[in-house]
């Protein structure tokens, strides 16, 4: 199905950020939800040499909020807010300085709290990147609307991404392929933020029965997922019947945290129907890892 969008009315602007170093945290040990203290690798920011969209979101030893790829931000607060607002998932990213100058990648997601943007590059590009390298993004997607579905609000989504997500219609509603469902009772860190346009919200994996019921062991970075009974139109609000679609941007975390979801589509009236599809992943839909041996979901 061809989505009717107002993309011809959207402004495309250039924003830029610098590759940020991985960040430390006071104290080496942190307590996991099961009560076991661990020395954790702080997984946000920096350059990940062997973690990319399409890889498992869980199972990485001693990691907290592990993100894929490369993260960028700006040292100036106002400029960083602009970067986080205007960069949209699926936008083109171009290395503007350093040894990898001219190489291209893709915007994957945005992370609240640290306020940075996550990018995907091919492994051979990653090897030539350094902290401080500047990345420019052709920001396109702010103001996007679905003309036939006014209740469904796109957020942080490049129009080209929505065209590749295999979205359809059924009985007057959008059908969106996702890998997993997330019930409202799991939503954790991020609730209370006034806007879903510039970050993410976590869902908790601390209950073993729920973890097993929803099959989260197969969760992958870049998976498209559906949050049930949550409306992200004006912040993260519980509302029965609402449905939100987002992308997994990081792995598990300490109590109250968990894998993060950057919002792509939300409907307070529930005019989105999630359809389970194990292949509903950012890397798969955009063909980012063609030629690589495909690993099975666990």
Question: Which residue ranges define each predicted feature?
Answer:
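Conserved mixed alpha/beta catalytic, RNA-binding, or beta-rich assembly cores of soluble enzyme
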Residues: 11-295
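Ser/Pro-rich intrinsically disordered low-complexity regulatory regions in eukaryotic proteins
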Residues: 1-2, 9
